[in-house]
């Protein structure tokens, strides 16, 4: 094994163009791609996760895609073990791992290990407190139960401090507090991480792209994809796979809870909220080089940067 070997991490909010850039980079540099996405691990979750298609996968293979059934609650701890195994395999092949995705908790435990829970910014904290003042902490506890039933079961509906902390973690990271409980034994990996962040400078560009992408997913038979999962009979809305943004809303449409327009509106809104949480975390990421998704010469910019640091 090389001394302090490189790992390149390509991070960014959903719909920022990470997959296209990763494939382009892997065709120009000695990279092998590892997906860092908590939804792409599931077989049958293809259209709604914007998973690389068969043609793209033939051009450039992606590791940690389609590795488990949607009935399996894949965890951050499992990702840590799987990613480490794939990284070592790529090293043996004298290639460089290119980790690509938007599940920030997964990147975090690889690079920094796990010690303390992430802190919330003041805007998030204030928003939760204002909602509690308006609706009461018991109502906030009900909402917590919808996104993190394990934590909600452990927290009294009147325990404002613990409810707020659980909500802060989710709003800041997009991951439930309960997902952190088993991570304390994981240590940062002994590699030199090159962090690249891909995001647009214009937020409206991302919002428009999210809306257009979801509408295209609907045209590409996303409803039928979720219907096949729904009709299996062994899946439910509490599973991590079905709680994935987009799938959760279509599931509620199929169950009759939402009409079509409500489903579409809520799915787009939830995806934008996901992007916001991802950007909140990315802005705090140490030692990262930012690139603008909107730049026409994006690929050459990134290649030049990587070659300039010795890749």
Swiss-Prot record:
Instruction: Name the residues annotated as site: Interaction with substrate tRNA.
Output: 103, 125
Instruction: From the record, give the transmembrane residue ranges.
Output: none
Top EC group: transferase
Which keywords label this protein?
ATP-binding, Magnesium, Nucleotide-binding, Transferase, tRNA processing
Q: One of this protein's Pfam families, by short name?
A: IPPT
Chain intervals for the UniProt region annotation (Interaction with substrate tRNA) = 37-40, 161-165
Q: What is its EC number?
A: 2.5.1.75
Names of the cofactor(s):
Mg(2+)
Binding site residues for ATP: 12-19
The intrachain disulfides are none
Q: Identify the domain of life.
A: Bacteria
Against HAMAP family, the record matches this protein to: IPP_trans
Q: Which PANTHER family match?
A: TRNA DIMETHYLALLYLTRANSFERASE
Function summary: Catalyzes the transfer of a dimethylallyl group onto the adenine at position 37 in tRNAs that read codons beginning with uridine, leading to the formation of N6-(dimethylallyl)adenosine (i(6)A).
**NCBIfam families in alphabetical order:** miaA (TIGR00174)
| UniProt name for this protein | tRNA dimethylallyltransferase
**Species name for this entry?**
Coxiella burnetii (strain RSA 493 / Nine Mile phase I)
Mind giving the lineage of the organism this protein is from?
A: Bacteria, Pseudomonadati, Pseudomonadota, Gammaproteobacteria, Legionellales
């Amino acid at each position: 094994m090389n001394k302090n070997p490189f790992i390149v991490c390509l991070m960014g909010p959903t719909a920022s163009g990470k997959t296209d850039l990763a494939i382009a980079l892997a065709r120009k540099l000695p990279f092998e791609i590892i997906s860092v996405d908590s939804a792409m691990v599931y077989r049958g979750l293809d259209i709604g996760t914007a998973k690389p298609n068969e043609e793209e996968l033939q051009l450039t293979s992606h590791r940690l895609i389609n590795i488990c059934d949607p009935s399996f609650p894949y965890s951050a701890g499992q990702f840590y073990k799987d990613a480490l195994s794939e990284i070592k395999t790529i090293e043996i092949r004298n290639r460089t791992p290119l980790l690509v995705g938007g599940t920030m908790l997964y990147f975090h435990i690889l690079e920094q290990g796990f010690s303390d829970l992430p802190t919330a910014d003041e805007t998030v904290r204030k928003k939760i407190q204002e909602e509690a003042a308006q609706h009461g902490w018991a109502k906030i506890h009900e909402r917590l139960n919808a996104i993190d039933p394990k934590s909600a079961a452990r927290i009294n509906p009147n325990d404002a401090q613990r409810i707020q902390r659980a909500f802060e973690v989710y709003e800041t990271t997009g991951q439930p507090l309960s997902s952190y409980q088993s991570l304390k034994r994981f240590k940062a990996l002994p590699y030199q991480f090159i962090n690249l962040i891909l995001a647009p400078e214009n937020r409206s560009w991302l919002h428009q792209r999210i809306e257009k992408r979801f509408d295209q997913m609907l045209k590409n038979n996303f409803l039928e994809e979720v219907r096949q999962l729904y009709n299996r009979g062994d899946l439910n809305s509490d599973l991590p796979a079905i709680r994935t943004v987009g799938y959760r809303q279509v599931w509620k449409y199929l169950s009759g809870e939402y009409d079509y327009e409500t489903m579409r509106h809520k799915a787009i809104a939830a995806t934008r909220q996901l992007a916001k949480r991802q950007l909140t975390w990315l802005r705090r990421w140490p030692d990262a080089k930012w690139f603008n998704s909107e730049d026409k010469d994006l690929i050459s910019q990134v290649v030049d940067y990587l070659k300039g640091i010795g890749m």
